[in-house]
Amino acid sequence: MSEEILINVTPPETRVAVIENGVLQELIIERSCKIGLVGNIYKGQVCRVLPGMQAAFIDIGLPRTAFLHLSDLCSKELEKKGSANIEHYLHEGQHIIVQVFKDPLGTKGARLTTDISIPSRFQVYMPYSNNVGVSQRIECGEERVRLKNCLEKFKKENECGGFIARTAAECVEDAVLMADMEFLLKLWESIRTKIATAAPKQFIHKDLPLSVRTLRDLYREGIERIRVDSKETYHRLVEFAEIFAPEIVPVIEHYTGECPVFDIYSVEDELEKALARKVKLKSGGHLVFDQTESMTTVDVNTGGYVGGRNLEETIFKTNLEAAQAIARQLRLRNLGGIIIIDFIDMKGEEHKQQVLQAFERHLEKDRAKSKITEVSILGLVEMTRKRTRESLEHILCEPCSACGGRGVLKTAESVCLEIFREIIREVRQYKVQQILVLASNEVAEMLLDEKADMLTELEAFLNVQIKFRSESGYNQEQYDVVLL
């Protein structure tokens, strides 16, 4: 499998595209006017404790207060007190060091934790933890033992917090890992110095910019190229790589081609498709994605694909294709939270298991943690996917001003009948002789064409003259009834 990363940099935003076998798999966008908060550390102030929710609202200097749940308190502190009551840990006015682990979303504030974690290329340092762990993606038993021994040795010698070896640490020499952990300790010391003098509600530390985080978090062995179209960003990445990851330097390229870097693999076209509700499958079937406040639903349909004579085999093949497409779309659209998938009903238990196993296999490529909880009695696949940043739709779109975010508009006929009722109401109340109706082009056209006979009858019934004026700036649901 060939893999590469494209980085597109402009003053307003940075975009990173992960390409696998020539196909866009993941897209991350960071805008200068709205940089993500995940990883940022603040000195917050408790403004409200909610015992009923076992949570607290923390003021960290943002427009909306952030949310801290009991389960997100430092594990060391929880073990020490052993209480399940938030009031035993926090009180109003208390100053507390917190880190954002989930960006604000919609009307919800940021989610916080007091279990601070600082990532590097190979490890994650947790200053308030005693634990040592190894990424689950490292499967070799001997390598897991080696890494754990290395981390525990360093922890014991330096009497510091806990560490987790990241996937990139696999097969890396102990000396390199030790140097990486030394760097993390020095970084934490500089953060502690800032904490000591910081005022409440003050920002303490922020994570690296997206372009540099790409090297730290997205690069792995097998990625052939990292192409960046900004000379300044290219030099910054090379400088970072020379210090922290020398093996990456040869794969970083400054892209100077005539066409935009995202046009190499038609990223812009794929981006437009990722915002669509319907996703076509190669077989002729399609997926339908619907996002709500509480969950995302995915419906699988055969569409025009009828296959051969065996209907069950046709459904099975469509579901297999859908399993791969859904896993890709969840990653590309960055959909998180509760996700319900309605695969096409299959009679055979073996086919059901094969589709579920294929889906789980495709999900393994995703960096975000996901969990398939169960298949419901109705045959729906229920799963969760960890959400730390906004979905693609939330970043790039806003609710439709015409429909108010419903996704549908009243038909022109419905609006016409609504106008008739409004006219009757106004005439009976104010006894007018003339009325002017302002409406959209579509509605005005229908009133003067298909509804012309009804209009004539209404004028005779009410003994009133009704005039119309088409307003090009009105959406289909907009109209005004003006008394003359």
How does the language model describe each region?
Residues 29, 33-52, 82-104, 145-154, ...:
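Phosphate-interacting basic helix/loop segments used at nucleotide- and nucleic-acid interfaces
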Residues 132-241, 246-268, 275, 389-484:
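Charged, low-complexity intrinsically disordered tails
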Residues 2-5, 25-37, 81-88, 103-114, ...:
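Active-site phosphate-binding and catalytic loops of NTP-dependent enzymes
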Residues 1-113:
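Charged, low-complexity terminal tails
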Residues 70, 239-269, 273-277, 282-320:
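Metal-dependent catalytic core segments for phosphate chemistry
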Residues 92-96, 199-200, 251, 295, ...:
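Loop/turn-to-beta-strand initiation segments
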Residues 52-56, 60, 64-65, 103-126, ...:
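Conserved glycine-centered short motifs in functionally critical loops
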Residues 75-77, 107, 112-120, 142, ...:
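A short alpha->loop->secondary-structure connector
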